[in-house]
Amino acid sequence: MTTDVAASLDHLRLLGALQDDFLTTIPQVDPTTRVPWCGRWRVRDLVVHLARIHHWAAGQASRRRETPLGRGPFDLVDLYATCAAELRATLTALGPDAPASTLVGPGPASFWHRRQLHETLVHLWDLRTAGGLPLDVDAGVWADTVDEVVTVMQPRQEALGRMEPLPAPVALVATDAGRTWLLGGDGEPAVTVTAGAQDLALLGWGRRSPDDDGLLVDGDRAALDDALGRRLTP
């Protein structure tokens, strides 16, 4: 599912730009640096993970089983460059309307344009933040990350039995993107979170806390904590 705003973004072009940023950032950060919001991962684990996801997604988009990459050790720059290029080349060759396997069943290959854009964006934030480096991405792109959590990821988690339905929706208001979402269904929200689109996206992906600067919580804080304590995303 995509909104009209999501459909207006050139996801494949943006994916390529963020992949390039990720690639050029790899040598700037010590591979042993901890990535604390990703459990016990260090930067080398993050890079290998995203490379593997790109490789796997290329297989899903083309409906073929990918060849395993093996255990390594890997040259991180070479590995990521190869897998990023493979994904872009695959998606470009297929075109947006080619039939593909997606996270929500059969669908168009364009699903992976969007999914891999947001996978890359969140992990680019991980990489650059772990290295103490800034990241400047348009609020409209971050808003689409929020939209994917609300319209694709959370409903999928619920459908797969990975989380129970929320008792009441959570309203998310992006002050810099002019957009509002209801996380967890329709109806009167129990609580509203107002913030920039980046902070809302990172909240949904477990990189931000409601107590962080820049997030305003109005309503039932316990309901928000309950929602965030569930598996909203894979």
Q: Where are the model-predicted features located?
A:
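Soluble acyl-CoA-dependent acyltransferase catalytic core bearing the H(X)4D motif
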Residues: T2-L14, R52, A57, G70, ...
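Actinobacteria-biased recognition of intrinsically disordered, low-complexity terminal regions
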Residues: M1-G16, T24-P27, R230-P234
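C-terminal interaction segments
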Residues: P189-P234
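Hydrophobic packing residues in well-ordered alpha-helices of helical domains and bundles
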Residues: H11-L15, P73-Y80, H113-Q116, T120, ...
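Short, mixed-charge aromatic SLiMs
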Residues: R71-T82, G140-R156, D220-L232
